[in-house]
């Protein structure tokens, strides 16, 4: 057996526990008599994840549920197998149900043809849908479900006291989860979710990638400003709200103006 490395009371992060980087952050919420997992990562890492849980002297049968922050493959490719082994329920946002149950390779980012990325995405039954305002009890721990769309339509965060398990909303360097219209991203929703995180009284953000960090409103505000600029840039295609250049050009056309510098 190995010593459990609690970062906060009742919270173990498996990258920190293993002292090595996995494909995604996996949080174990220890409620005493039972526990839950937030995300499970890639299928080829699942055996290591389960072995690590065993080595920490947690019974596999004590897992109450797996919470999917969203349906992306790096968070959920191992979900079906984990559900089978742990014999627990899988909970996800209603908009994550179809991608997970259908094994949709595009919406889960398991297939990105332009980058020659293609990994299998096993179909996984979602036993329970969870959404904004739901409260989850894991032994003596309570998590409040937040709907924080933007990166994906089904992105969830989980509040536990001063902690916010914040998914792919924002990372310690100010980066955010990938923005891609084919993936279901929405910049306006993303900005609203970041504003909510900025304005909340959580002390720490526990993201799905990279280190846990103290909530920094200046960092979040800078990220919001950057994303707001994206809403007016052609670079972001249909994720953008408008493209001011074309409005300017329309005015120039109407005025018969040809400005060649």
Predicted regions, residues:
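Divalent metal-coordination and catalytic microenvironments
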Residues: 29, 39, 49, 70, ...
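Short, charged, surface-exposed secondary-structure boundary motifs
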Residues: 23, 100-103, 174-175
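Conserved beta-strand hairpin/beta-sheet module of binuclear metal-dependent hydrolase folds
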Residues: 2-56, 157-167
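Metallo-beta-lactamase
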Residues: 35, 42-44, 135, 142-149, ...
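Active-site HxH/HxHxD metal-binding segment of metal-dependent hydrolases
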Residues: 42-46, 54-135, 225, 232
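Short Pro/Gly-enriched beta-strand edge/turn motifs at strand-loop
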Residues: 7-14, 113-118, 140
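A structural micro-motif
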Residues: 9, 88-89, 203
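C-terminal regulatory/interaction regions
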Residues: 236-261
